[in-house]
Swiss-Prot record:
SUPFAM superfamilies recorded: Inosine monophosphate dehydrogenase (IMPDH), Thioesterase/thiol ester dehydrase-isomerase
Function noted in UniProt: Polyketide synthase-like protein; part of the polyunsaturated fatty acid synthase composed of the 3 PKS-like subunits A, B and C. While the saturated fatty acids (SFAs) in Thraustochytrium are produced by the conventional fatty acid synthase (FAS) pathway, polyunsaturated fatty acids (PUFAs) including docosahexeanoic acid (DHA) and docosapentaenoic acid (DPA) are synthesized via an anaerobical PKS pathway. PUFA synthase assimilates fatty acyl-CoA, the product of FAS, as the starter unit to synthesize DPA, and this starter unit may be butyryl-CoA, hexanoyl-CoA, or octanoyl-CoA.
Protein encoded by which gene: ORF-C
Protein name according to UniProt: Polyunsaturated fatty acid synthase subunit C
Region of interest called Dehydratase (DH) domain 2, as start-end residue ranges on this chain: 797-937
Length: 1497
């Protein structure tokens, strides 16, 4: 969930009582809640609470992983005032696609646990001033009554109240009582009553006997009469009475048939038992459907416990105990499983589990489950089962949970269940849950899914993941003969319900060609229309019509729009064949001719489907005829209406969302697909599309579920003849129809009037035109248009308004205002097209009505005449536009209103550009908002007749003939120059791949942009893309798109995930193998190679001067696995193994030249170290390797002809091992050294060692500076540690994200501790630097632990080691003997007290990195975080952008970080071209020119 960012938030102790209790103030935000949970209470409640922080245990909220509170909005309590009625209100924003989610529903445990702030309330009241770390909070009782469920994306609100206290004999609080109400959107969801928690010492907790059955309890159980289960055992799985761990995991994946068999309706079940992380039942050793005292079922489940399971350390910090809510959730999971086992789902069809409304669920906790190896045993007895008033089945159960501690020798015996609950500590019931009640609620009566799932695009098909299965058809050249198909007579009896209605699309022109198939036809409430578009002839992509296989042809798309969906997408979509689900637009709006390919799909298990709907790229094509109906209806023959452009851009998204199976993630069959918003950029408005194929590359950028809604996000890019002219981003939603029953619009349901009505503009200022077909308004509006004008829309189909109201010089900006109204007619042509079974007006046509209003304003105000434009016509102005839809118009709507406010009118270079913002209403509800509508008035061809005479006419033979007779397209010229401001200049500079021609008026200083070089008078800003930076051979050698690699951060901080993420975007990443044991390096290499079989990737080889076996083991692994790129770092001298790796990859090409397979990047910080990598391998090392048989004579001979490394990465002031040298000093020295040695060694040009730069590269300026100094590539390091893929913990990421360049210092290094070598680390938020330096000081001062003063040794043990020296030494011995297999080192240390001291100190130094990477909560102050000064520049660079964790709520992606740094460097290079040109006088240091990462790349 995104963090709520507060600027200058006031701490609670500075708030007034009114601010604390008003409910309108954010009393505590998420950051403060996290601090309370994991950090210091004094920082949250105020200085008076600071003394509590000295206690190792105190009342806390759970840590981040189970912290289920987002904010506190009310605190009505006072410190040290234990009063009844104290109150607190909290909120929790349920995350979408959260890791605890049950397929959209909020699980039982989260609903209950999100009311956890009774902990914070009693803490605020001061309980720890009494407990003083000796007593800890434990929940005892609670009764929960549910009235519904919550869904992802909703906000839970908890009103928590204190109802009483109990005191000990010494007057201290022993227990407190509380209750809460939980609401969602004002609706009561949960009542929690009888809440009770106590405060206990360790001794009191240990003495607890658990839940003890009284004699009355036992007597009552003995009197219970058994009931008959048979009426409810609909189809019990009697063959399956135990479940294994694997089978329980399978139920999490919704695969019930694999566990219980294909009978009893199991294949049709589409229900996820729980989130994988939330699975609290690992196995079920017993299912007895006639067992238990009630005879309705006895089920026994088991949860395996390990000390390191996730739920212990997060609940709570330094007081680990399993949360009762999680334990109780296991009861819910068992009951769900049993109800399905009985076959009750056969009575409902598709279902959801819901709590039984109004039924109390009582929980008693009488023992703590602290970390241990063992298991929980759940003993569930069904006490009631039946059907409610809606005939939904329900079940109620009692559950006892028994804690079995293997470490205490405890066991569980099924045969002795009766002994539990009798007070025996070895048979202790820790939780007693009475009355858990669930029902199976019917989802719908829609058609169920087929029992056999067939993938849309099976993995084995050659078409998946590649476009190479068939070459995409090239965009055709303009041809006057490429026209729309001739109409074919439609048959009669075409409406749904007519027994004579055809079942095939016999009127499709393509079906009339011999050998072609005929698409099927499914009648609807509307009569079909003629086929408006057919593919251009001769395209080989249009021949194979196999459903679900790329490409999808005209036949597949015809099926998708009005036939059988499964005949387009494959049999998995059969359930949609007869549903009312949205389809691809039909007839006149069918603007996807074919889907050429889909790539980048990720075939994984995702909810109930077999691919990740967030991953995929599709190429769609539209063959645009020269005389399409929309051209005939436009103002001139070559003008494509903006609505059609929008549809072409967006419709491929509608195909891709289905190919990615998003509809299959929805529970219902009748689901609706709606565009929500978009940002688009018309980058080239001079392209003629007639007779050409428009290609659309649409990429999915994300998919998420929000309750019953799925949201899909895409980017798109349109091109013709490889010229990109339109691009943008958009999002769509999949909805159930009920969502639109009461649409809220843009104003939260409030209806409003158009602006001129609300502002009561005098009627005399409003000029109205009736523009219905045949009405006089069409003629009068255009009566005064200049001679030869083509400004009017020429057909009724191109008109979207009945009446237009214009107010000159009015609107919000005083530049012009237009209002239009249309009476919605259920027979409007577009309802049949969009969509065939789901009629709704396309949003694009609503936007088009706004364009029509802007055109009317331009005509009314005679903008063409005022600016002397001859033969004016309508065309497009390049630029950006955005739209947002929050409602719809359907055939049931009555009236559509739209309005526009002109925001600018600019005349330049022979054209006039009009820009406006607009809104649209559906029956008084404002539902659309559009910004930056752009219309251009430009000179065109003289009109063949007056504009008035063509009003309402159809496209005549004259128009068609004029289209055919043109020999070439006639784009409207934009003029030789265009005046631009600084904002526009920056926008143009950011178009990195386009040259920019500029001039400047010497008098006014006005900048002008030209379309060409303007006879040499313009400054030329050359394109600069990523490939134009650095040395291109670096990119060619490693197969990457950028002159950059992400450097290896040791101990897996540069993780496999980080390397894979970079590699998938063709960026080289180096895995941080240094300091890791061999088995982890092997696992990482296997993972990387599986994900990147063709690369690119590198693995770090770090010099190990004290363990040559480790270096050899790594090289053995690299050669075994075929690792072809190694980053060699920290080498103070060349070693046999690094030379062996290089030589082992050498062979001869056919021409005798050396073929290099194994590449080395040498990471150095000194000239003498660079020299050893630039020269050939030393002779003595080659001879040694030959003698040992590790290389051949041939390989040695070849090694004498090549440098040891292909690349040198010059490491300047950086994190970890560093010489702190500035890059502007060391980089030129090493480049000069390389040049000299290259000549001296006589290498050919192909063997020139490239020199790159690393250290301090945290922003575009640093990258640009290094590259301008001659770096062939750059290396990033510290900045990648902040990224979500790095192998460290969120505590470290958080600390790094708040660091500045000065928050670093030097501290002793573990690997070369004795030599006094230091490394650069983060000092903010950790005591590691001072403690590590203290250890080195002691090492230098004393020869042994025995010679240290006792107080010094005690300080080391208590403050630094935090354990006894004997324990440290034992762990050190275990590590060297069992992990490093180096007992000799320990034997030496036993004889050498100084070495023993060194090894123990290195124990701390080494573990400090592990604690940081693993996020060990109780060693936060000892975190060792390698960090360079680049972190300060990086944090400043991303502040306030989408990469900023405080803005996005998540840590950035390594790909985005590195691409943005490089893109910024490209931009700066172009900006510097202006700075250095004497013809341009521009203040480039202006804040307007600062590069900021504004969107995902």
């Amino acid at each position: 969930m995104a963090l709520r960012v507060k600027t200058n938030k006031k701490p609670c102790w500075e708030m007034t009582k009114e601010e604390l209790t008003s409910g309108k103030t954010e009393v505590f935000n998420y950051e403060e809640l996290l601090e309370f949970a994991e950090g210091d209470i004094g920082k949250v409640f105020g200085p008076e609470f600071a003394p509590i922080d000295k206690y190792s245990r105190r009342v806390r909220l759970p840590a981040r992983e189970y912290l289920l509170v987002t904010r506190v909005t009310l605190m009505d309590a006072e410190p040290n005032n234990y009063r009844v009625g104290a109150r607190m209100v909290t909120e929790y924003d349920l995350p979408v696609n959260g890791e605890l989610s049950e397929g959209g529903d909020c699980p039982w445990a989260v609903l209950v646990e999100s009311g956890q702030c009774d902990l914070m309330l009693i803490s605020y009241m001061g309980i720890d001033f009494q407990c003083q770390g000796d007593r800890v909070y434990r929940l005892l009782n609670t009764t929960l009554t549910f009235y519904g469920v919550a869904h992802e994306g909703e906000t839970l609100e908890y009103d928590i109240r204190v109802t009483g206290f109990a005191k000990r004999l010494d007057g201290g609080i022993s227990m407190f009582f509380f209750e809460y109400d939980c609401y969602v959107n004002g609706r009561l969801l949960i009542e929690m009553r009888d809440g009770c928690a106590g405060f206990f010492t360790n001794e009191e907790l240990a003495a607890g006997k658990g839940v003890v059955f009284t004699r009355a309890d036992l007597a009552a159980r003995a009197k219970v009469a058994k009931q008959d289960i048979s009426p409810y055992a609909v189809a019990p799985c009697l063959h399956k009475t135990t479940l294994s761990e694997k089978e329980m995991q399978t139920l999490v994946d919704k695969d019930w048939a694999s566990v219980f068999g294909s009978k009893n309706g199991m294949p049709e079940i589409n229900y996820k038992l729980c989130a994988r992380k939330m699975l609290m039942i690992d196995r079920v050793p017993k299912i007895d459907h006639t067992g238990g005292i009630y005879g309705l079922g006895l089920i026994v489940g088991e949860k395996i416990l390990e000390r390191d399971h996730w739920y212990f350390p997060c609940h709570f910090v330094k007081d680990e105990v399993m949360a009762g809510s999680l334990v109780s959730d296991g009861c819910s999971q068992m009951l769900k499983m049993y109800m399905i086992w009985l076959g009750l789902h056969l009575t409902t069809g598709p279902f959801d589990f819901r709590p039984v409304s109004g039924h109390p669920n009582k929980v008693r906790c009488r023992g703590q489950i602290s970390p241990h190896k063992g298991k929980l045993v759940y003993v569930m007895e069904i006490k009631e089962i039946g059907f409610d008033e809606k005939n939904d089945p329900y079940a109620i159960a009692d559950v006892n949970i028994i804690d079995i501690d293997y470490e205490k020798g405890q066991t569980f015996e099924m045969s002795r269940l009766g002994d539990y609950g009798k007070g025996d500590l070895n048979k202790k019931i820790v939780v007693d849950f009475k009355g858990i009640a669930l029902k199976m609620q019917k989802r719908s009566t829609s058609t169920e899914e087929p029992s056999k799932v067939v993938p849309v695009f099976a993995k084995g098909q050659a078409t998946v993941g590649t476009e190479a299965s068939r070459a995409p058809g090239a965009a055709t050249a303009y041809s006057p003969d490429v026209l729309a198909p001739a109409p074919v007579a439609l048959p009669k009896n075409l409406l749904k319900g007519d027994p004579l209605a055809p079942r095939e699309m016999t009127w499709h022109p393509m079906a009339r060609i011999p050998g072609n198939p005929t698409p099927s036809f499914a009648p609807s409430a509307y009569a079909p229309r003629n086929i408006a578009f057919t593919p251009f002839p001769g395209n080989p992509l249009d021949n194979d019509h196999t459903p679900g296989k790329m490409p999808l042809t005209w036949f597949n798309m015809a099926e998708f729009m009005a036939g059988k969906v499964s005949q387009c997408l494959g049999p998995e979509f059969t359930k949609f064949d007869n549903s009312n689900t949205s389809r691809s637009p039909a007839w006149d709006l069918a603007l996807v001719t074919r889907a050429v390919s889909v790539t980048d799909m990720e075939h994984v298990k995702w909810r109930n489907i077999d691919c990740n709907p967030s991953k995929g790229t599709m190429i769609g094509e539209f063959d645009c005829p020269a005389d399409a109906w929309f051209y005939k209806g436009a103002a001139n023959d070559g003008h494509m209406p903006y609505s059609i452009l929008m549809e072409i851009a967006l419709q491929t998204s509608g195909v891709l969302t289905s190919v990615l199976k998003a509809p299959l993630t929805m529970e219902k069959d009748d689901i609706l697909f709606r565009n929500l918003d978009a940002n688009a950029d018309f980058v080239r408005a001079d392209v003629d599309f007639r007779g050409k194929t428009i290609r659309n590359i649409t990429k999915c950028t994300g998919y998420s579920m929000l309750g019953e809604m799925g949201v899909h996000r895409f980017s798109f890019e349109l091109s013709v003849d490889d010229v990109v002219f339109y691009k943008g981003t958009t999002s769509f939603g999949w909805f159930v129809p009920e969502v639109f029953a009461a649409q809220a619009g843009l104003d939260s349901g409030r209806k409003s009037e158009p602006w001129f009505v609300e502002q009561k503009v005098p009627a005399g200022q409003v000029v109205s035109y009736d523009v219905r077909p045949g009405a006089s308004g069409r003629t009068s509006l255009f009566a005064n248009a200049p001679s030869g004008a083509q400004l009017n829309r020429r057909t009724n189909q191109g008109q979207y308004l009945d009446k237009i109201d214009l107010v000159s010089g009015s609107g919000k900006q005083g530049l012009g205002y237009g209002h239009g109204v249309k009476a919605v007619n259920p027979n409007d042509w577009f309802f049949a097209c969009h969509f065939w079974f789901d009629s709704v007006m396309p949003g694009s046509l609503g936007v088009e009505s706004m364009f029509q209003l802007v055109e009317a304003i331009a005509v009314q105000d005679d903008l063409a005449g005022k600016h002397g434009i001859a033969n004016p016509t309508i065309t497009h102005a390049p630029g950006k536009i955005s739209w947002k839809y929050r409602g719809q118009l359907t055939p049931k709507s009555k009236q559509m209103d739209s309005e526009v406010h002109v925001t600018s009118i600019e005349a330049h270079d022979g054209v006039v550009d009009v820009v406006a913002d607009g809104y649209l209403w559906a029956d008084g509800l404002r539902v659309y908002q559009v910004n930056n509508i752009r219309v251009r008035i430009a000179s065109g061809e003289p009109a063949a007749s007056s504009s008035a005479s063509s009003v309402g006419s159809s496209a005549s033979a004259e128009v068609a003939e004029r289209t055919r007779s043109k020999a070439a397209p006639q784009p409207v010229a934009s003029g030789p120059a265009q005046s631009i401001n600084l904002e526009q200049l920056k926008t143009d500079l950011l178009e990195l791949d386009a040259p920019l021609y500029l001039s400047q008026d010497p008098t006014t200083g006005q900048l002008k942009k030209h379309t060409d070089v303007a006879s040499g008078q313009a400054t030329i800003v050359q394109p600069c893309t990523l490939g134009d930076l650095g040395d291109r051979s670096f990119m060619e050698t490693y197969g990457v798109v950028a002159p950059l690699y992400t450097g290896a951060m040791a101990k897996g901080i540069a993780s496999a995930d980080l390397v894979i993420a970079a590699g998938k975007r063709k960026i080289l990443g180096s895995f941080g193998a240094g300091g890791l044991p061999m088995h982890l390096v092997r696992e990482a290499v296997d993972k990387i190679q599986a994900a990147l079989p063709q690369g690119p990737y590198a693995v770090n080889l770090i010099h190990s001067p004290f363990d040559s076996n480790l270096e050899k083991g790594n090289v053995d692994l690299f050669l075994e696995k075929g690792v072809t790129v190694v980053e060699a770092s920290a080498f103070m001298t060349l070693t046999p193994q690094v030379v062996r790796y290089r030589a082992a990859g050498l062979s001869r090409n056919a021409d005798g030249s050396v073929r290099i397979r194994n590449r080395i990047i040498g990471k150095v910080s000194r000239t003498e170290l660079a020299e050893m990598f630039i020269r050939p391998a030393p002779e003595h090392l080659l001879e040694k390797l030959i003698a040992s048989g590790e290389i051949t004579q041939e390989q040695a001979e070849l090694a004498r002809r090549v440098p040891v490394a292909d690349d040198i990465a010059v490491e300047a002031d950086s994190g970890g091992h560093t010489d702190n040298r500035p890059i502007h000093v060391i980089l030129p020295l090493i480049i000069n050294l390389r040049n000299r040695l290259h000549r001296e060694c006589g290498y050919p040009a192909s063997l020139r060692v490239r020199v790159g730069a690393g250290g301090g590269v945290g922003c575009p300026q640093a990258a640009a500076a290094a590259l301008s100094m001659g770096a062939a590539f750059i290396v990033t390091g510290t900045v990648n540690q902040v990224c979500k893929q790095s192998g460290t913990c969120d505590n470290v990421r958080k600390a790094l994200s708040k660091a500045s360049y000065s928050d670093i210092c030097m501290a002793p290094a573990a690997d070369m501790f004795e030599e006094g070598v230091k490394l650069q680390v983060l000092k903010k938020g950790t005591m590691f630097p001072s403690r590590a330096n203290k250890l080195y000081e002691l090492f230098c001062k004393y020869d042994s632990f025995e010679s240290m003063p006792p107080n010094e040794l005690e300080r080391v043990e208590k403050r630094i080691f935090q354990r006894a020296l004997a324990e440290v030494w034992q762990e050190t011995k275990d590590f060297y003997i069992n992990r490093l297999h180096n007992p000799e080192k320990i034997q030496r240390a036993e004889r050498d007290p100084k070495l023993k001291m060194s090894l123990c100190f290195r124990w701390y130094l080494g573990l400090a990195s592990f604690w940081a990477n693993a996020g060990i909560a109780d060693r936060v102050m000892d975190y060792q975080v390698w960090c360079g000064p680049a972190i300060g520049a990086f944090n400043d660079f991303i502040k306030g952008t989408y990469l900023d964790p405080e803005v996005s709520g998540e840590y950035p992606c390594v790909v985005q970080v590195n691409l943005q740094i490089l893109r910024g460097a490209c931009y700066l290079r172009r900006l510097n071209a202006l700075r250095n040109d004497p013809r341009i006088d521009l203040e480039t240091e202006d804040a307007a020119f600062v590069y900021e990462p504004t969107g995902s790349l």
